[in-house]
A protein has these predicted regions:
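A broadly tuned preference for mixed-charge, low-complexity surface segments
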Residues: 20, 63-64
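Short, charged, intrinsically disordered terminal tails
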Residues: 70-71
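Intrinsic low-complexity, intrinsically disordered segments enriched in polar/basic residues
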Residues: 2, 44-47
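Generic structural motif
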Residues: 30, 42-44, 53
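Cys/His-rich microdomains that often coordinate metals
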Residues: 48, 67
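Short, intrinsically disordered terminal segments enriched in charged and Pro/Gly residues
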Residues: 1-37
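Short cysteine-rich clusters marking metal-coordination/redox-active sites
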Residues: 41-44, 60-63
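Short linker/helix segments within small regulatory modules
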Residues: 49-59
Length: 72
C-alpha cells in the first residue's frame, strides 16, 4: 500500500492496515482531548469508531484482531 500524505484525521485517509477515515462524529473519544472518528476496513467493510490519535495504528476489530471500536 502506498503512502497517504493526508493528515490522519482527514476524511479519506487510509492507514497502513487499510483502515479508511469516513467522518468525524464530533463526539468525544475516550482518550484525552480526542474525538471519535468512523473508520471502515478496506478488507471486510466493517465500520467502527476510533480516537483520532489511534487512527494511524488501528486494525479492524472484525477481521484483523483490533481492539473493539468506540460507540458513535
Amino acid at each position: 500500500m502506498g503512502a497517504d500524505n493526508r493528515r490522519t484525521t482527514e476524511t479519506g485517509y487510509v492507514n497502513r492496515r487499510g483502515q479508511a477515515v469516513l467522518r468525524d462524529t464530533g463526539l468525544p473519544g475516550n482518550d484525552h482531548n480526542q474525538r471519535t472518528y468512523v473508520l471502515r476496513c478496506g478488507a471486510c467493510a466493517h465500520e467502527y469508531g476510533a480516537n483520532g490519535s489511534d487512527i494511524w495504528q488501528r486494525r479492524c476489530p472484525a477481521c484483523d484482531g483490533g481492539a473493539e471500536g468506540l460507540p458513535y
